[in-house]
Amino acid sequence: MNRKEKNPAGMILRAERIRQGKGQKEVCYGICVVSYLSKIERGSAEPDMAILKQLFARLGINYETDSAFLTESRKQIDEFFYNLQYGLENETVWKKLAGKWDWLLMSPLTIDIRLVSVIYYSESTWKEVDESFIESLMKKEADGNDIQNFLNENVSTLAQLEDCMDEKQYAYYSLVCSRLTKDPAEKMEWYQKVQHGLQNTLGMRCLISGYYEQAEYDAIHRMENRFVTAALEEGNVYALVDYYFMNGSAYACVDMDEMMTVYYERTRRLLQNTGWWKEYEQGLYYNMGATYLAVGRYEEALDCLNRVRSEDFLLCHKKAWLHLLLGNTREADHYLAIMKQLLSRKDMKGKMAERLMYEELCMEQKQDFTADPAYLDLIERLIRALIKEKSFGFLYQYKNCLLYTSDAADDLTRVD
């Protein structure tokens, strides 16, 4: 995609016109012809200042051109993207930029501030974000607002400004789009665009996420030399840690416990003296516990799972399963009861995979459960749900159950 810098005034006109839901004819009536406004917005015409002022006035735009203000804001925006690449805290710099929101929207930095805002708030699905800015917008908007509405509105505006973006801006726009879509193939297309535009470890991490989601684990393994070299050249410990964690997780998904342990140990050692340990600790111990459970290293599995502090559904599932295998009926019943309670919550409504995972464990409490035709039916429904709702790692953990039911089905066929 060939991208070049556009006239900032044209970008402002176009962005604000779109935001207000106005057509070109409505904006330029009595000032200039539609074709001239179109050229201004596309950056293909150098606008007459007298006409530009009239167009700005019609849209209520106070165009920000103060050099000191723009220089300071540019530095803060660059700091935000630097922090994003190196895994550093961004709330402080976001608050500084959010305080200048209205002025930055009407400045040559309009695309950048929208990108910063949607990147920041698209992270709300996995971590806490500052909502005071959104709350302040709610007071201004008659119909109210929330994070999702904010994201939808600004991503829609950015989509209209794609041809005004340079390579890096388009890469960051692609990053947001990858976070907002649920389709794996579409995600991968966006991830590839991120890497094409950034050509750094942040882009490579996006590619790795795509490979992980599509269970292309070999592709993650093959990236090791290239990724480690890039991370060392950047001096980026966070990226290096993230690669080792993802590579270890890829091995965990196929129960390769020895290779998983190698990469998770590298992750732990790199993190042990940093502030990032808490970010990775729980996922690391959960994955290790689940993998040790799958390969029959039960005591090590119990040790790892006991280090996970939150009692969410998946942790309770692994603990209940583990205690059933260890013959600890009372402990298994305890975690099954928690799972049943969690399934009654509103946020679990419609999660068929979780419901069937619970039912499968309940059936495992019965003697000779694999010989029960009802268990075969349950496993078939569970596998369909996992394929539809979960990643390959979830499916792989039931490989032994599939073998049991396959043998049982063969026995039933021979009896018939």
Language-model segments: which ranges?
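Extended amphipathic alpha-helical coiled-coil/heptad-repeat regions
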Residues: 132-382, 391-395, 399-402
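A short, Lys/Arg-rich alpha-helix, primarily the initiator
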Residues: 1-19
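Short alpha-helical DNA-recognition segment
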Residues: 20-39
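The alpha-helix within a helix-turn-helix
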Residues: 17, 28, 56
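TPR-adjacent "capping" and linker segments in tetratricopeptide-repeat scaffold/adaptor proteins
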Residues: 65-74
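DNA major-groove recognition helix of helix-turn-helix/homeodomain DNA-binding modules
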Residues: 48-66
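Helix-turn-helix/homeodomain-like alpha-helical modules used for DNA recognition
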Residues: 74-124
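Conserved small/polar residues in nucleotide/adenosyl-binding loops
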Residues: 404-413
